[in-house]
Amino acid sequence: MENLTLKTLNEADLQGKIVLVRVDHNVVKKGKIEDPYRIDSTFATICRIYAKGGRPVLMTHVGRPKDKKTGEITMEEKTSVMPVVKYLEKKLSLRIKVPEFKAEDAFGYKTLCKEVMDPLLGELKSGK
């Protein structure tokens, strides 16, 4: 049986590739970034991916925002990842796109709409 090894970021050929990066940017409280350390600590990874010709796709969240009365998941400006997006855009001089989520009451969670994701993925693949 062949031994498979996972390449490090420095070893990987990222030219023209889309790289999914799970980041812990869960630092927004009441619509503001309390401490940017977690965001800042990902700059080297994001920049390395770009330097190697890759296109990073960041995946994060901001807590589990629930309405205190109903217990339902809510999507409000104060629990949005937009403060993180604006911070990254400013610090790294990037343009970042964030897909919109749609509430699915029957399931009690948010899902990505195909109508939203298909154009974003198309742009990502074409390098826009």
Residue ranges: model-predicted function:
Residues 1-128:
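Active-site loop-to-helix "anion-binding N-cap" substructures in soluble metabolic enzymes
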